[in-house]
């Protein structure tokens, strides 16, 4: 086992990465190794997808499957080894079908990619784990060095984050052939184990640019189906009655659950990254969507144990449900998996609803605590002139985007302290689950404009980017000249691709933490600092002083 893709990876003087019987996320060595094997199979599939496009062949089954299966290897998504192997078998079957399509056009069609003809050696998980050793990401580290390995992983993990957003967009009916062609090209190239530093740096920027397009179609999918988010008050306390909790990012799953629970007497609560759903008109119209429950994903083993109803996980992040003994009432959807946990194959939430009706639910309603979400793209753009006016009248000094992933490290208190230290004449824009570090605190307003503005999920970084570009255009300056600073927390691969997106768009002087990714070497950090001004957090006082004086 070797895995260094998330922020909580093991770090020692001898090197970084989880390499024992179990990773810090709870992933076993078996599952981790089989995920490496799956990635190799997916690289072979993408190699043939690239070849097929040369013949004018576009196989939508391949396009739909490939990012979804890659998403299953993202941190805290799928811990179920047999399902990972199932994805690998499906990848190979699709590859062979695509290969046959190519051969039907050109009898001499061939693919030089080293992953193009990969076959699984056995049905036995032990045999497959041994085969997976051929594809351990750091197997040639001694030959290529830490810097090349780090850049490879930056590209692989960044592309994995983009694949997750591609799957979210696909679920909402969005498709862009250019994006899929670019995805397959990059995935296939990574299967050649590239070792050219400049080419890898260029690839990282290409992934960032591609992901901007992915976030654009995801935004289109969400707003077309569910309307544009508008500021909405959300109760974060319990309401009397039977209940279901839904977590993750998949708004379609939430919509289906709300439709199927309507009139049943079962209330629905959002959790984690599902919180922004309350801002969408077509979702909040359901009166039994009563509120948001819990805090950051890392606290779920305590909070889920206390929730008196079933829980549905639609995407990341799931962690061991046996710790809180709620594994008999947690359900996984789509690419999510945990051994022994019930999995919903289709869109029928009937079994979950039946379980909710058999459980006690909340015995009484707590005193409400209201927070505001729903500052989506249209709302943000509608406030652009107000922001410019406040800046021109020196009522608004600076905007801080403080957001990103949450996690368990104590150092993440930095982001709470930073938010509460922001001066009263400054505004905080936030998104993703890092907001749970401070989103239930009171920040007041500036002439009626809330000082804390929740822009949505991690992918809603797209809205923040569009706002920044709009402000720059109206002020006749560049984005980097705005009174705007980005202070970002990271944990997993979606955050990595958001960072690559920002860098590829030329955004500079981003401050990130609580630690640097384990696959970033000192040399890579120096390169990113020199090219983009990217740096790690220090202390709240020093960072605040530097950002306000920039």
From Swiss-Prot:
The family database entries (Pfam families) matched by this protein are listed as: Prismane (PF03063)
* One cellular-component annotation, GO: cytoplasm
What does the Swiss-Prot or TrEMBL cofactor note state?
Binds 1 [2Fe-2S] cluster. Binds 1 hybrid [4Fe-2O-2S] cluster.
Gene Ontology BP annotations = nitric oxide catabolic process; response to hydrogen peroxide
Keywords associated with the record: 2Fe-2S, Cytoplasm, Iron, Iron-sulfur, Metal-binding, Oxidoreductase
Residues bound to [2Fe-2S] cluster are 3, 6, 18, 25
Catalysis performed (reactions): A + NH4(+) + H2O = hydroxylamine + AH2 + H(+)
Q: What is its main location?
A: cytoplasm
Compartment annotation: Cytoplasm
Q: Where does hybrid [4Fe-2O-2S] cluster bind?
A: 249, 273, 317, 405, 433, 458, 492, 494
Cofactor(s) needed for function: [2Fe-2S] cluster; hybrid [4Fe-2O-2S] cluster
For the modification Cysteine persulfide, which residues carry it? Answer: 405
Task: Name the Gene3D superfamilies on file.
Answer: 1.20.1270.20, 3.40.50.2030
Top EC group? oxidoreductase
A Gene Ontology molecular-function term? 2 iron, 2 sulfur cluster binding
Record EC number: 1.7.99.1
PANTHER family under this entry? Answer: HYDROXYLAMINE REDUCTASE
| HAMAP family the UniProt entry points to | Hydroxylam_reduct
Query: What family is this?
Result: Belongs to the HCP family.
Function, as annotated: Catalyzes the reduction of hydroxylamine to form NH(3) and H(2)O.
Q: What is this protein called?
A: Hydroxylamine reductase
The organism is Salmonella typhimurium (strain LT2 / SGSC1412 / ATCC 700720)
Q: What is the lineage of its organism?
A: Bacteria, Pseudomonadati, Pseudomonadota, Gammaproteobacteria, Enterobacterales
Which gene holds the coding sequence for this protein? hcp
């Amino acid at each position: 086992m070797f895995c260094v893709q998330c922020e909580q990876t093991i770090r020692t003087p001898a090197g970084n990465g989880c390499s024992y019987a179990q990773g810090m996320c709870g992933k076993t060595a078996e599952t981790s190794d089989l995920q490496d094997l799956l990635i190799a199979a997916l690289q072979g599939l993408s190699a043939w997808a690239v070849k097929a496009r040369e013949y004018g062949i576009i196989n939508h089954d391949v396009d739909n499957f490939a990012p979804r299966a890659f998403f299953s290897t993202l941190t805290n998504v799928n811990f179920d080894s047999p399902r990972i192997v199932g994805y690998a078998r499906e990848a190979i079957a699709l590859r062979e079908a695509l290969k046959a399509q190519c051969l039907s056009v050109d009898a001499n069609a061939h693919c030089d990619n080293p992953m193009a003809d990969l076959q699984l050696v056995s049905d036995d998980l032990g045999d497959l784990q041994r085969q997976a050793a051929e594809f351990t990401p750091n197997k040639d580290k001694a030959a290529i060095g830490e810097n090349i390995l780090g850049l490879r992983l930056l590209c692989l993990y960044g592309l994995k984050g983009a694949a997750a957003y591609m799957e979210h967009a696909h679920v909402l009916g969005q498709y862009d052939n250019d994006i899929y062609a670019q995805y397959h090209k990059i995935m296939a190239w990574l299967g050649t184990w590239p070792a050219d530093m400049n080419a890898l740096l260029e690839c990282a920027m290409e992934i960032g640019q591609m992901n901007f397009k992915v976030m654009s179609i995801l935004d289109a999918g969400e707003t077309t189906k569910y309307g544009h988010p508008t500021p909405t008050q959300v109760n974060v306390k319990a309401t009397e009655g039977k209940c279901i909790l839904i977590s993750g990012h998949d708004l379609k799953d939430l919509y289906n659950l709300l439709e199927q629970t309507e009139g049943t007497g079962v209330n629905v609560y959002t959790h984690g990254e599902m919180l922004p759903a309350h801002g969408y008109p077509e979702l909040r119209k359901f009166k039994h969507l009563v509120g948001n429950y819990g805090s950051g994903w890392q606290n779920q083993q305590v909070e889920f144990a206390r929730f008196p109803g079933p829980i549905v996980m639609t995407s990341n992040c799931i962690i061991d449900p046996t710790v809180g003994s709620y594994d008999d009432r947690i359900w996984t959807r789509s690419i999510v998996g945990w051994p022994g946990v019930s999995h919903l194959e289709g869109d029928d939430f009937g079994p979950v609803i039946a379980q909710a009706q058999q459980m006690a639910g909340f015995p009484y309603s707590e005193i409400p605590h209201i927070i505001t979400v729903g500052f989506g793209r249209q709302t943000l753009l509608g406030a652009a002139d107000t922001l410019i006016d406040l800046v021109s009248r020196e009522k608004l000094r600076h905007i801080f985007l403080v957001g990103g992933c949450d996690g368990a490290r104590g150092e993440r208190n930095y982001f709470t302290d930073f938010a509460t230290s922001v001066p009263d004449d400054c505004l905080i824009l936030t998104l993703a689950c890092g907001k749970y570090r401070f989103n239930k605190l009171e920040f007041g307003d500036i002439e009626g404009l809330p000082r804390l503005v929740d822009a949505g999920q991690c992918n809603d970084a797209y809205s923040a980017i569009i706002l920044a570009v709009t402000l720059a255009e109206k002020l006749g300056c560049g984005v980097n000249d705005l009174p705007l600073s980005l202070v970002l927390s990271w944990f997993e691969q979606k955050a990595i691709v958001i960072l690559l997106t920002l860098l590829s768009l030329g955004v500079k002087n981003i401050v990130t933490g609580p630690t640097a990714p384990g696959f970033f070497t000192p040399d890579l950090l120096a390169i990113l600092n020199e090219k983009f001004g990217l740096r790690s957090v220090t202390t709240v006082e020093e960072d605040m002083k530097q950002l306000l004086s920039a």
